[in-house]
Structure formats: structure tokens, C-alpha cells
Amino acid sequence: MCAPGYHRFWFHWGLLLLLLLEAPLRGLALPPIRYSHAGICPNDMNPNLWVDAQSTCKRECETDQECETYEKCCPNVCGTKSCVAARYMDVKGKKGPVGMPKEATCDHFMCLQQGSECDIWDGQPVCKCKDRCEKEPSFTCASDGLTYYNRCFMDAEACSKGITLSVVTCRYHFTWPNTSPPPPETTVHPTTASPETLGLDMAAPALLNHPVHQSVTVGETVSFLCDVVGRPRPELTWEKQLEDRENVVMRPNHVRGNVVVTNIAQLVIYNVQPQDAGIYTCTARNVAGVLRADFPLSVVRGGQARATSESSLNGTAFPATECLKPPDSEDCGEEQTRWHFDAQANNCLTFTFGHCHHNLNHFETYEACMLACMSGPLAICSLPALQGPCKAYVPRWAYNSQTGLCQSFVYGGCEGNGNNFESREACEESCPFPRGNQHCRACKPRQKLVTSFCRSDFVILGRVSELTEEQDSGRALVTVDEVLKDEKMGLKFLGREPLEVTLLHVDWTCPCPNVTVGETPLIIMGEVDGGMAMLRPDSFVGASSTRRVRKLREVMYKKTCDVLKDFLGLQ
């Protein structure tokens, strides 16, 4: 039997030995490896290949570990990062992520995501989205409501979004009623007419669904889809109706700031800001005609949507006279995008509100403006031709505000609008306004403020003191307050004498430009011929405001017209 001290001795030596062995292991602990998924971000491959161009910027991430194995955490157009499908460059010598086993194969390695395929990256099998598709067309209708060039493109889209898409039966749209037996109601591959028959079988663009007003909170993402049919297939463009500026036309695959037009001509606005509010217009064109559809967008700050909704339903009648007042554009401090009712356009439009509160014609949202001021029916002649989702396919007529003519279109039989007439005669009887009714359309200058300024021979601020009507022309005496531009008349020598301006080609039942006698200061832009000041129906004549005048002074100071000379074709 061993003595008790013997056991105690070996116990202490054992503890000491364990401590000595553990200390080096602690010192040799490896630093943590920052794991990175295979591949590179799309905008590292091509600066113009923006991430997340058709999704919602909601799949935010900080590192690759938060994403699927076939994805990377990449910067997006919203200023954050999103999980998106990785891209690959076929360049020898590129190194992949560290710490992965080599000499692996794709045998027995399955990629579960639709549209992904196995690839070896630095000896490691990984799943990546297909980056090449065959060029042969086989139009495929998918469960997301879109039509893809072929099945491969549908699978690639599903992979890039991390979703599942399935093939669905395509909707077949007749372009015109036909006396021959109708084709099958549905077909997987839509048939197309040969080029030789296009001249005999054409249809102007028509909408399938009503344009909808959307109201979103700051920071959200919103999209508009202009669902249009026609033969031949219409070309689509988007533009925002801008105040005193030329509209910027955007085509498919176009990015401008936080606004993207996708390859299917869907308008997407990311990280919406207050200044993004307004009316976005879709224009569809083909050889048979043109169509314009307006999509209003209201932007409210967080917590403001409920207050706006409640205030519009509080039962208080809005004074009708306030709706007829011009927008309050004076600058009294903070500027904000608001909506005002335009009586001539019979619609609500955006403007820059300067918080002067000279009148009540300013609203937070398009809906609040329409509820307060749209007491009468909507001007049906300004509505786009609407085919609707049904398939009765009957010929109808609609007034086209772009061409000023009534044109034929195909009506599906349901969910149409008021711009729908059974005959050309009925259409012409009602549009552009009912005969015998003296309501006139709003006068529209050919160009916006800056372009009109650069193209005009003279620009003055003044008030009309006298107006003389003649058969198809007229004369106006204008008291000039200030001369902003004068290239051919020498107005600085005029002194306080009124300037005589000749009005050309005037229809006095609905005169344009709308020159009226009064004390309201106007901005008048016109041409000079033989020393005579002249205004045409599309000349710019508008109410003077601090903001407009400030803009024109800025154009003069910066010599903007010299920069635009080549683009505008000025001499």
C-alpha cells in the first residue's frame, strides 16, 4: 500500500504537466478566417451593371455569410448592400476564397436553386447562376406575369432573385375582330404576323389595365408597369412631368439616379424621396398610333400617411374657389414638393411649395388634391384607350389627345373607361370637348421654360393693358416691367411706352396663348420679324413667379443657352 503523500505528489505533478501543455496551444490559436463566397460582384465586373436593378433592395446584408452559397453581398442602388448572384470572369490566375478543399468535382453535388448550375471554383464545387443563354427565341410566359425570350432567361431571372418561377399559359390578344374562325383561346407560344401582313393588320397601342395612383413612404421602393398591346408591338418610353423643365425621356435598360427602366419597360424607383413625387407618363408608339398614360406617385414621410388620410375624410368641405387659384410658388423659406389642382388641365400636378400660404391650393398627396377639387367628372377625352383584360374584342373609337384625332382600338368588353365610343362620329361629337361647350383645353407651349427662353428672340416681364381681337389674329399692348432678353428690337430705348405684340393664328373661341388683360404679371416669350414682336399659339406665356424669374436669371448668368446651342440647333 502506498503512502498518502505518494498520491498527493503525483497529483500535483500531473496538474503542472497539463498547464505546461495547454499554454503553447493557446499561443498557437489561429486567427478567425473571414469567409468569402466565390465570384465577384456585378458592378466589379462592369461599372454599368448595377446590382438589384429589378428587385426591392430589401435583401440587405453585411457579409457574404448572410447570403446563399451562390451569392455575394454587393453594393446596390439604394446605398446599402444586397445578396445577389455572383458573377465570374474567365481570367487565368484569379484566386478564389481561401480554406476550401481542392480537386472536388460536381459529381453528386446538387444545386437546388432554379437556374443555378454547379461549377468548380478553386477546387470547390459551388452553385452559380447561369450567365449564358441560347439565342434562339422560344417566348415563355412565367408565373411572375412576364414573358421571357426563352426558358433559360426565365430560369436565370429566378436564380438572380432567389425565387422559383414556373411556366404558365400565355394570354393571346387579338389585334382586331376577325371573320375567320377564332384561333385557340390560349397558346404557349404567341403567334406573330409576318412582315407582309403588318400593313393590313395593324392596331394602335391600348392599355390592358387602368393606370393606378400609388402613395409610398420615404425610403420605400415603387414600380409602375405600363401593360400595353398593339400591332406591331409598341415601343415604350417613360418620362416625369417636370415643372418649368424639359422632361427626360427614359427607355428600357436606362438608369438615372434612383430611377430605373427595366428591360421589360417597367419603371422602378428605389429609396423614394419627396422630390420623386409627381406624374410619370408612359408613352407607347407604333406605326398605327401613339398612347400616353399617366401614373401619379405621392410620397409621404413616415407617420404622415395616416394623418393625410384622416384629414381628407374629416367631412370639412374644401372651398371651391381655392381650387381655381394658381399654385403658390413664392419662396418664403423651405421648399417642398406639393400637389395643386390645375383647372385648365382638370387634373392635379406637382409644384414647388415655398410655404408662403397665400392660398389653400396645395396638398400632400395626389389623392387628397383630387378629393378636394375634382368636383366634376374626369375629362374623359384625356384618358388613354383602355382594352381591358376581357376577350370580347370589339372595335371601338377613342380620342387621342396627342394627335387630336379619334382613332380605332380593340375593346375587350370589360373594365374600360369613358374614352370609349361605338363610332367615329360619336367620338368626334364628344371630344376634345362636347360641341357647343366652351370649355377649352389648356394652352401648351412647344417647349418648357429654359428651352423657350433660349429659342425666343425676346423675353419680357409685363402686364397686358389692352387686347384687340381680329379675324384670326390680334394685338396686345404690354406694359413692360423688365426686359430679360432682346436680340432684335432695342427695347431698352422704349422707356415706359407699352410694347405692341401681334398674335398670329388665333382661334378666339379658345385662344392660345392665353393672353388676358389684367394686373397679373406675365412672362412673355416670342419672335421678332421685321422689327415686330409676335406670339404664336405655342409661344410661352405664363404667370410670373419668384422661382421662375430666379431660374431665368440663373440661365442668363450661367450662359446656359450657349451650352445648349448645339443641341437646340440655334444659330
UniProtKB/Swiss-Prot annotation:
Signal peptide: 1-29
Main location: secreted
Domain WAP: 34-87
Highest taxon, organism lineage: Eukaryota
Gene Ontology MF term list: receptor antagonist activity; serine-type endopeptidase inhibitor activity; transforming growth factor beta binding
Domain Kazal-like: from-to ranges: 121-172
PROSITE patterns the UniProt entry points to: BPTI_KUNITZ_1 (PS00280), BPTI_KUNITZ_2 (PS50279), IG_LIKE (PS50835), KAZAL_2 (PS51465), NTR (PS50189), WAP (PS51390)
Single Gene Ontology BP annotation: transforming growth factor beta receptor signaling pathway
Disulfide bonds: 41-74, 57-78, 61-73, 67-83, 129-159, 133-152, 141-170, 226-282, 323-373, 332-356, 348-369, 381-431, 390-414, 406-427, 440-510, 443-512, 454-561
General function of this protein: Protease-inhibitor that contains multiple distinct protease inhibitor domains. Probably has serine protease- and metalloprotease-inhibitor activity. Inhibits the biological activity of mature myostatin, but not activin.
Protein name listed in UniProt: WAP, Kazal, immunoglobulin, Kunitz and NTR domain-containing protein 2
Organism expressing this protein natively: Mus musculus (Mouse)
